C-alpha cells in the first residue's frame, strides 16, 4: 500500500546521469519567437494543442474566473502534505479536486477525494450557494473541454488518408475518442510566486524557476489527454531579475510558461510556450515555469479510477465480508471458509480499506467539510465495514491459535496472513508518525491530519489492539523452525 521509493530513486539516478552527461552545458529550447519553433512543435511535440482565450465564450471565462476567485478567498485550496523520496513536504501549489461524485485521484502517496460537481442522480448538499455555483462553473468548463478535446483528437486522427480508413475503422476511432475525452475530475491549482521563498531552477535547459517540476501526470486512463485552463489572477510587481538586461523575447521571467521535453533525452530541443490568461493546453509531459503574477490552472483529466471510486471499494468490502457469517439468532460471528487464499484476500482488502481510504481521508483533516458533507456518510459506512474486517482478523487468530487447529493447517494459515498483518502494523505506525510530524502540526486546525482510526488497548469495542506487535511475535513463533 505504501508508495515505493524505488521509482523516485530511479528517476533521481536518471536525472543525475543526464546532468553528468551535459557536463554543465544546457540543452537548447525554442519559444514562439524563435526560428524553427513551429517545425519542432510539429515534429516532436505534435500532441500539444493550444487554444487561445478569445476563442472561448466570454461568459464561460467570467463564470470560471469568479469560481476560482471565490474558492481561493474562502480558503478552499490547500497545500497538500505529500511524500517524496520517503520525506513529507508541502506542495508549492495549493489545490483542490472537483469531479464526479465518489471519485478519487492519487498522486505522491496522497489520495484526493473529489468535491462533487453537480451530477445526475447525485444529491449534493453544498455548504452554501457560492460554493455550489463554483462547482457548477467547474463542471461547465469540464463539459466544454470534453467537447474541445474530442474535436482536437478527431482532427488529428482524421488526418489518416481515405485509402487507409474503412468505415469500421472510423467507427472504432470515434468510440475510442469518445472514451478518452470524458474528463471525470478537475484538479484546480493556485500559486503566488511572490509568496514562495524558494522555487527550484529548471535543471536541463536553464528556463528559470519551476512552479511544477518535470513530470508525467499520474494515474490517467491510457492515452487520454489532459486539458488545462490557465488564468493569471491579478497584477503584482514584476519579478526581480539579476542585472539590468532586458528579458529575451519569448523568455520573459514575468510570464508563466509551460515547457515540454522528450523524457530522459538530452539531444532533442525543448519547447517553452507563454501561458496567457485563459489559454488551454493538452499534454502529458511538462513542467510549469513560474511567472510573476499569481496563477490558477484548472486541469481536467480522465483519472484511472478502476481502484479509486466508492463503488469499487464497497465492492471490495463485499468480497471480504462474504467470508463472515453471523448466526441469525445469537449474532455470533464465524468464518465461512478457512482456505488460506480466502483468508489472505480478506486481509488484503482490510489493508486496502484502512490505508488507501480511511487513513488517506482523515490525514487531510476536516478540509472537505468546507465544501459539503457528501463524503461523511460513505466514510462512516466504510469504517463500519472495516470494523467487521477487524472482527474477521480476530476470528482468524482465534482459529490458528486455538488448540483444535492441526499444526500443519495452523502453520499454512499463519504463513499466508502474517506478511499482511506485518504490513498493517508497519503502516499504522507510519501513518501515526506522519500525523504527529512537525509539518503536520503547522497546519490550521481544520486541515491538521487526524490519526484515525486509532484506539487504546482499553477500548472494549475493538477486538484487537492498534499495535499488533505482540500478536505478530506469537505468530512468528508458530512459523519459526521450532514453532508448534
Task: Describe every region a protein language model picked out.
Residues 1-484:
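Non-heme Fe(II) oxygenase metal-center motifs and adjacent flexible, charged/small-residue loops
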Amino acid at each position: 500500500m505504501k508508495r515505493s521509493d524505488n521509482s523516485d530513486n530511479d528517476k533521481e539516478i536518471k536525472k543525475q546521469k543526464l546532468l553528468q552527461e551535459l557536463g554543465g552545458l544546457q540543452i537548447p529550447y525554442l519559444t514562439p519567437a524563435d526560428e524553427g519553433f513551429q517545425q519542432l512543435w510539429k515534429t516532436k511535440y505534435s500532441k500539444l494543442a493550444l487554444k487561445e482565450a478569445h476563442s472561448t465564450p466570454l461568459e464561460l471565462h467570467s463564470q470560471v474566473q469568479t469560481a476560482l476567485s471565490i474558492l481561493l478567498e474562502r480558503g478552499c485550496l490547500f497545500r497538500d502534505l505529500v511524500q517524496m523520496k520517503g520525506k513529507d513536504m508541502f506542495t508549492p501549489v495549493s489545490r483542490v479536486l472537483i469531479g464526479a461524485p465518489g471519485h478519487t485521484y492519487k498522486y505522491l502517496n496522497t489520495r484526493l477525494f473529489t468535491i462533487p460537481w453537480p451530477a445526475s442522480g447525485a444529491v449534493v448538499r453544498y455548504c452554501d450557494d457560492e460554493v455550489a455555483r463554483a462547482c457548477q462553473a467547474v463542471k461547465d468548463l469540464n463539459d466544454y473541454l470534453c467537447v474541445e478535446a474530442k474535436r482536437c483528437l478527431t482532427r488529428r486522427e482524421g488526418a489518416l488518408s481515405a485509402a487507409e480508413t474503412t468505415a469500421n475503422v472510423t467507427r472504432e476511432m470515434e468510440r475510442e475518442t469518445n472514451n478518452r475525452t470524458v474528463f471525470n475530475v478537475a484538479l484546480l491549482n493556485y500559486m503566488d510566486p511572490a509568496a514562495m521563498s524558494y522555487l527550484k531552477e529548471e535543471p536541463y535547459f536553464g528556463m528559470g524557476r519551476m512552479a511544477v517540476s518535470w513530470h508525467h501526470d499520474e494515474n490517467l486512463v491510457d492515452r487520454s489527454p489532459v486539458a488545462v485552463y490557465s488564468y493569471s489572477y491579478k497584477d503584482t510587481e514584476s519579478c526581480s531579475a539579476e542585472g539590468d538586461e532586458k528579458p529575451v523575447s519569448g523568455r520573459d521571467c514575468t510570464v508563466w510558461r509551460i515547457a515540454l521535453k522528450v523524457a530522459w533525452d538530452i539531444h532533442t530541443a525543448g519547447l517553452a510556450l507563454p501561458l496567457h490568461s485563459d489559454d488551454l493546453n493538452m499534454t502529458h509531459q511538462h513542467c510549469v515555469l513560474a511567472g510573476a503574477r499569481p496563477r490558477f490552472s484548472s486541469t481536467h483529466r480522465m483519472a484511472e479510477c478502476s481502484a479509486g471510486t466508492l463503488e469499487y471499494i464497497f465492492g471490495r468490502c463485499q468480497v471480504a465480508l462474504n467470508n463472515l457469517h453471523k448466526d441469525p439468532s445469537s449474532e455470533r460471528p464465524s468464518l465461512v471458509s478457512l482456505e488460506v487464499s480466502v483468508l489472505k484476500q480478506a486481509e488484503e482488502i482490510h489493508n486496502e480499506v484502512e490505508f488507501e481510504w480511511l487513513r488517506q481521508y482523515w490525514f487531510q483533516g476536516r478540509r472537505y467539510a468546507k465544501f459539503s458533507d457528501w463524503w461523511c456518510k460513505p466514510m462512516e459506512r466504510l469504517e463500519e465495514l472495516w470494523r467487521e474486517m477487524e472482527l474477521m482478523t480476530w476470528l482468524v487468530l482465534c482459529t490458528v491459535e486455538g488448540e483444535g487447529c492441526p499444526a500443519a493447517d495452523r502453520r499454512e494459515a499463519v504463513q499466508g496472513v502474517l506478511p499482511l498483518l506485518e504490513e498493517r502494523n508497519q503502516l499504522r505506525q507510519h501513518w501515526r508518525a506522519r500525523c504527529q510530524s512537525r509539518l503536520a502540526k503547522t497546519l490550521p486546525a481544520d486541515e491538521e491530519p487526524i490519526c484515525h482510526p486509532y484506539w487504546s488497548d482499553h477500548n472494549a469495542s475493538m477486538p484487537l489492539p492498534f499495535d499488533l506487535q505482540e500478536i505478530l511475535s506469537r505468530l512468528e513463533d508458530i512459523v519459526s523452525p521450532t514453532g508448534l
